[in-house]
């Protein structure tokens, strides 16, 4: 945050995938400072993609500014989405089960990649995306993916 403030910028943390961690807990920007914007959603961790429900935490002195901006950009999420999102927050057992499925799938993919010779990759520590080094097979990732 010091770096962003030194150039007159605000620090924005996209925390859409928080909650989907495997090895260690992700740190929220709010654990470091209150002088940040945090963007989050029910889409990923709560498996509510398409329900159009999310939230934003802003510094106290910017709340009214963001409210005015939001009033001109969108109205609100559908009522049914808001009710479902509130209920989803109390579904701890289901959320834990979902995370276990992600964790098992992550292991299957990691083992499978190693089995087929793709042994250099960054395992996902949050979310479920793999960044794989394919340089010994191709220098063109698009062609490689099309061939696969």
Question: What are these model-predicted stretches?
Answer:
Residues 1-148:
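PLP-dependent class I/II
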